[in-house]
Regions:
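NAD(P)-dinucleotide binding in Rossmann-like oxidoreductases
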Residues: 52-58, 68-130
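Short beta-strand scaffold segments in enzyme catalytic cores
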Residues: 63-65
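C-terminal helix-rich "cap/oligomerization" subdomain common to oxidoreductases
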Residues: 68, 132-167
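Predominantly a Rossmann-like dinucleotide-binding segment in NAD(P)-dependent oxidoreductases
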Residues: 1-54, 166
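Conserved glycosyltransferase catalytic-site signature
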Residues: 25, 29, 57-61, 146, ...
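Active-site rim elements
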Residues: 18-19, 117-119, 140-142
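A general structural signal for well-ordered alpha-helical segments in protein cores
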Residues: 28-29, 126-130, 156
Length: 167
């Protein structure tokens, strides 16, 4: 994730804001879990050792999550890239195929049958709210099991603690 620089005086960097790792990467860990479909067995974090105040470890880290089936998800989160480039690019490698997602607008496939291009970005917020409302109205369980939500939070908390101690 090429998050771009946000001044360290901004609210997101306050204790109440939680930091960008908490505020953004948690969604990526949740997406990893959805794609892999297996529990996490370990998490490793390597944060930037900065030389200037404009590049801090809590905004610049590589996080690798290892799953029960041997799959792994790696997030490169950085604030030192240019905002002129894509913010979010994901590559999924599996079964001799490659899926590239660009800013949640375009999906390119290699070794698979179809590409997808949207006119606007779709991170699924609207559909998530619809699903939540349907669960409430119909008194159904939420589609994401509690254990998976808790696991995502535990990963996020562990990563946040690691990048804070790297300073």
């Amino acid at each position: 994730m090429n998050a771009g620089y946000i001044p360290y005086s901004a609210w997101v960097h306050t204790p109440e804001g939680g930091g960008r790792i908490v505020g953004e990467s948690c969604h990526i860990f949740d997406l990893f879990r959805f794609l892999v479909g297996r529990p996490v067995v370990s998490v490793s974090v390597d944060a930037l050792a900065p030389e200037t105040e404009s590049a801090r470890p809590d905004d610049n880290a590589v996080i690798t999550v290892l799953y029960e089936d041997g799959s792994m998800g790696t997030l490169l989160y950085t604030s030192i890239g240019t905002k002129n480039a894509e913010k979010e690019t994901m590559k999924v490698f599996c079964d001799e195929q490659l899926f590239e997602l660009h800013d949640y607008k375009e999906l390119k496939t290699y070794g698979a049958s179809a590409d997808l291009s949207l006119k606007k970005q779709d991170k699924g917020h609207f559909r998530e709210l619809q699903a939540f409302a349907e669960c409430m109205v119909n008194e159904e369980r939420f589609p994401i099991p509690w254990e998976e939500l808790k696991e995502t939070w535990e990963i996020t908390r562990q990563v946040a603690d690691c990048v804070r101690t790297e300073k």
